[in-house]
């Protein structure tokens, strides 16, 4: 099932029953870090490839600042078009993919849980923040799958495992929020699977419009 324009958005926020005190899993003083880290996993190697550019441009309108880090991993429809960006005001700072994972070339599989894990390890280590938000961006099919990439996709158990592994490596506490900019991901089954990995889960119970979230209001 895919994102379509005419439908209204119904959002579901599910709060974990056991919120965790926020800490930072690195040597930097928490007070010196930006309050918010916004890490966006943009799986656009499908019919949403043009929306990757549109949403990235919206993020550039805001840009990272003393209170906010915006970091993205993007993939679009053509080959050799995967990129890791630190989004700044009206621009981006790109990190070569081989610096994140030495096996990565210029085309990565966004439907692989290892890709999500490696992105989060890199993004939260290089651009740490007091409160961390992971957004998984793409088509969604509820508990069945999300982040489609030429036949591969992420399942919800894969997402849980990816976040568990990233947290084990970095020592980070549960995320402040996991958000799905994708259709049909506001399900109790999804929230239950991810309940130990984030304080809040945010997703749509219905179809999202093609444009998805509005990122120029971060």
Question: Residue ranges of each PLM-predicted region?
Answer:
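Secretory targeting signatures
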Residues: 1-31
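N-terminal extension/subdomain marker
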Residues: 29-130
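Structural recognition of the beta-strand scaffold that forms the well-ordered cores
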Residues: 37-42, 69-74, 132-136, 176-180, ...
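Solvent-exposed loop/turn segments at secondary-structure junctions
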Residues: 44-47, 76-80, 138-144, 150-153, ...
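Mature extracellular/periplasmic domains of secretome proteins
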Residues: 57-61, 161-165, 189-195
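A short, glycine/acidic-enriched catalytic loop
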Residues: 99, 140-169
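Active-site groove signature of glycoside hydrolases
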Residues: 123-143
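Active-site-proximal C-terminal subdomain of hydrolase catalytic domains
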Residues: 175-218
């Amino acid at each position: 099932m895919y994102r379509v324009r005419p439908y209204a958005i119904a959002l579901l926020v599910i709060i974990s029953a056991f919120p965790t005190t926020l800490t930072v899993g690195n040597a930097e003083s928490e007070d010196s870090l930006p309050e918010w880290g916004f890490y966006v996993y943009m799986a656009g190697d499908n019919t949403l490839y043009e929306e990757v550019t549109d949403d990235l441009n919206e993020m550039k309108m805001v840009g990272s600042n003393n209170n906010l880090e915006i970091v993205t991993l993007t993939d679009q429809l053509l080959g050799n078009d995967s990129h890791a960006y630190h989004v700044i005001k009206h621009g981006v700072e790109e990190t070569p993919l081989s610096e994140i994972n030495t096996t990565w070339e210029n085309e990565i599989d966004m439907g692989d849980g290892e890709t999500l894990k490696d992105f989060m390890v890199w993004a939260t280590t290089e651009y740490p923040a007091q409160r961390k938000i992971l957004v998984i961006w793409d088509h969604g099919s509820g508990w069945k799958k999300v982040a489609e990439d030429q036949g591969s996709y992420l399942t919800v158990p894969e997402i849980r495992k990816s976040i568990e592994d990233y947290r084990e490596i970095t020592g980070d506490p549960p995320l402040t929020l996991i958000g799905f900019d994708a259709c049909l991901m506001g399900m109790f089954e999804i929230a239950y699977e991810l309940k130990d990995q984030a304080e809040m889960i945010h997703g749509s119970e219905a179809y999202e419009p093609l444009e998805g979230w509005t990122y120029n209001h971060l």
